[in-house]
Amino acid sequence: MDVTHDIPRDRPVARKVETLRPLQWLKKGFRDFQKAPADCLFYGAVFVLMGYLLTLYSEHSPELVITFATIFLLAGPFLAIGLYDIAKQMEAFDGHGRVKLAHSLSAWRVNLPAFTLYAALLAVLVFGWFRVSLLMFALFYDTAALPSLNDIVVNAFNPDNIAFLVAYFAVGFLFAQVVFSVSVVSIPLMLDKEVDTVTAMIASVQAVLKNLLTMGIWAAIIVALSAVGFVTYFLGLIIIMPVLALASWHAYRDLITFER
């Protein structure tokens, strides 16, 4: 059974949802995971592999930590495209059929121009954070050569360096907020209705602004579960990332409606 993609005639509009709605998204995401565990675990395994590569190649250099974290941020949403497609297939099948992994692997082709522009814009945002991070480290250490990762960990959490920690995490939080706001429902929207990148990002920001507390809870859930995945030496990501992606599809369905 092929999944069709509708050309939108209506404009996407954000709507208000219940404050604790993210808990329902998470529940639905786990339910979807149980319906197609093998397909979801394939994507989860890729996230785990990315985590190990990040650790392997960035153990002794902060530049590489940031670089590979950037790659993770850029590649992550595009891996999620396949999981969004799996969620969409489940909706289309309505329990009568099996999702196709091969279909999900090529889902990005349905709206290639929009996804390409999205990747470019996200790359600009993440590269901006990359440059700001290097600048802050350089100013903090006041040296031409960047410190080792061990030096950063040891010195950054020294009480004497509290000003650096506050500034670093404040700037990082700002960048994270921007990326979250423009992406929380934009990729599912671009996949589902084939809208352009700017329209999808605007709808995503509107969804966040209309549901500040709700989206704050959703962001906290994402961060908390991702942290669990990292502290389990990335093994937890094999389940956590697919569940979060599938849950994000349900978030999109709840947060976005269409009007003429």
Predicted segments, located by residue:
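Hydrophobic alpha-helical membrane segments
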Residues: 1-260
